[in-house]
């Protein structure tokens, strides 16, 4: 083991960012390092159960300043609907004084951050090294976040001709466009100004995209692996869902989860429900209530609950996704293909059906479907609309034992998972990354 160090972590205030940062913090703490985790107070309460080393990982609360347009009490992106997201980044920027004060008082050796592009300036002022630890895919960073690139257009030399936006993806780019452009500027600025770049991925999945980023930014890109939580270290699956799933045959249940960022229009939500119903398979759906509906039940299609009461559950609340995917009765995962969910799907034994909504999810989906060929994508019309029929066809194509495409993606998925779970591969990424940080900190102290 190298010299122990003290790292600051300042992730973007979204749970899809904070959670993998905390998983990495646990790995660092396991090796004897200290971490100060800078997040809002409310998020601290929601994440503390994931802190496996509370003596080594200390939460440092930040107060979110008031910004016109930001609802009172909002501290993370999950507190506000997408149209209001634009108001939170300026509020996060206003925490800079608090971050500087913490750096001055606690003297970390290293600061890990992702979207707060001013962190390298603070780090340099206090003679601390900065590392941009990115939790979105190298595929999408290389496509949308390189200097001089045009959003939505593959830059020169991009290492894939298959990972492209198509006409029907316009909805994903438009719905996210203003926020995504600002996000893009922040990320590119951070990548250009930080001392080191690291990404939550591995070369077996995204090696050529990581190499492309190294050439674009003239910096070594360090990889941590997927940084998934340790199995069996959290709470078990809730009894009510475990008992419900036990009532179905092995591999027969369709599990649908679209992430906390996706809120469907009511008509599209109903099409989702009807499409899954059309398969005739048992199903478990966990999505946020659609726009204009206070509860999921308010928005369900007429007669739906009565028709599916013995074989379907539709929830508008958070669920234990990794544990549901691991249940023997679950055989298909219908996902938005956020990067965390992408990894969880790969590490599961489920057939994978993808229904992306945001720009990075589209590219993740093309990686899974076109490059790796481990999944199928739900077909959309040019307007971006997906029909109940197209959804049902996609699910049935992978669940039908006689389906050629179903057998192809099953074989490819099985081979890929076999590589990733081979002895020492993913733990090797973690160990090598921690060794790298120890060496970087030691070299910095000798400068």
From Swiss-Prot:
Binding site for UDP-alpha-D-glucose: 260, 319-321, 336-344, 358-361
PANTHER family in the cross-refs: ANTHOCYANIDIN 3-O-GLUCOSIDE 2'''-O-XYLOSYLTRANSFERASE-RELATED (PTHR48049:SF176), GLYCOSYLTRANSFERASE (PTHR48049)
Family: Belongs to the UDP-glycosyltransferase family.
EC number: 2.4.1.-
GO function term, MF aspect, one: UDP-glucosyltransferase activity
Disulfide bonds: none
Matching InterPro entries: UDP-glycosyltransf_plant, UDP_glucos_trans, UDP_glycos_trans_CS
Protein's organism: Arabidopsis thaliana (Mouse-ear cress)
Endpoints of the signal sequence: none
Identification of the protein by name: UDP-glycosyltransferase 79B10
Domain of life: Eukaryota
Transferase recorded as keyword: yes
Keywords: Glycosyltransferase, Transferase
Pfam families, per database record: UDPGT (PF00201)
Enzymatic class: transferase
Keyword Glycosyltransferase among UniProt keywords: yes
């Amino acid at each position: 083991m190298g010299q122990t160090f003290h790292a600051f972590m300042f992730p973007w205030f979204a749970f899809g960012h904070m959670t993998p940062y905390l998983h990495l913090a646990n790995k660092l703490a396991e090796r004897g390092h200290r971490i100060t985790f800078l997040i809002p107070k409310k998020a601290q309460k929601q994440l503390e159960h994931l802190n496996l080393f509370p003596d080594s990982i200390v939460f440092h609360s930040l107060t979110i300043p008031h910004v016109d347009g930001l609802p009172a009490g909002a501290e993370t992106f999950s507190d506000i609907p997408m149209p209001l997201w634009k108001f939170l980044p300026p509020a996060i920027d206003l925490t800079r004084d608090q971050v500087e004060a913490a750096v001055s008082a606690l003297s970390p050796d290293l600061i890990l951050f992702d979207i707060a592009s001013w962190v390298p300036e603070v780090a340099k002022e206090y003679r601390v090294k900065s590392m941009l630890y990115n939790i979105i895919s190298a595929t999408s960073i290389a496509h949308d976040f390189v200097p001089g690139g045009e959003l939505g257009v593959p830059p020169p030399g991009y290492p894939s001709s298959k990972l492209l936006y198509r006409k029907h993806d316009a909805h994903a780019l438009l719905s996210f466009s203003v926020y995504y452009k600002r996000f893009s500027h922040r990320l590119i600025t951070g990548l250009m100004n930080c001392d080191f770049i690291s990404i939550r991925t591995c070369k077996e999945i995204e090696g050529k995209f990581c190499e492309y980023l190294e050439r674009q930014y003239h910096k070594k890109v360090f990889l941590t692996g997927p940084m998934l939580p340790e199995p069996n270290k959290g709470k078990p699956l809730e009894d009510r869902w475990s008992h419900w799933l036990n009532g179905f045959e092995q591999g027969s249940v369709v599990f649908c989860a679209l992430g906390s960022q996706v809120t469907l229009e009511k008509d599209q939500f109903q099409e989702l429900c009807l499409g899954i119903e059309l398969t005739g398979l048992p199903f478990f759906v966990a999505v946020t209530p659609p726009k204009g509906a206070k509860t999921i039940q308010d928005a369900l299609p007429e007669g739906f609950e009565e028709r599916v009461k013995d074989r379907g559950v539709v929830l508008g609340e958070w669920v234990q996704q990794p544990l549901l995917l691991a249940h023997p009765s679950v055989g298909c995962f219908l996902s938005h293909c956020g990067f965390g969910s992408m990894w969880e799907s790969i590490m599961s034994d489920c057939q994978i059906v993808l229904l992306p909504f945001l720009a990075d999810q589209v590219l993740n989906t093309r990686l899974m479907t076109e490059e790796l060929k481990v999944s199928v994508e739900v077909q959309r019309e040019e307007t971006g609309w997906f029909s109940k029929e197209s959804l049902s066809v996609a699910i049935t194509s992978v669940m039908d034992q006689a389906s050629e495409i179903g057998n192809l993606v099953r074989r490819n998925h099985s081979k890929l998972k076999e590589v990733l779970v081979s002895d020492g591969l993913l733990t090797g990424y973690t160990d090598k990354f921690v060794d790298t940080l120890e060496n970087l900190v030691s070299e910095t102290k000798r400068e």
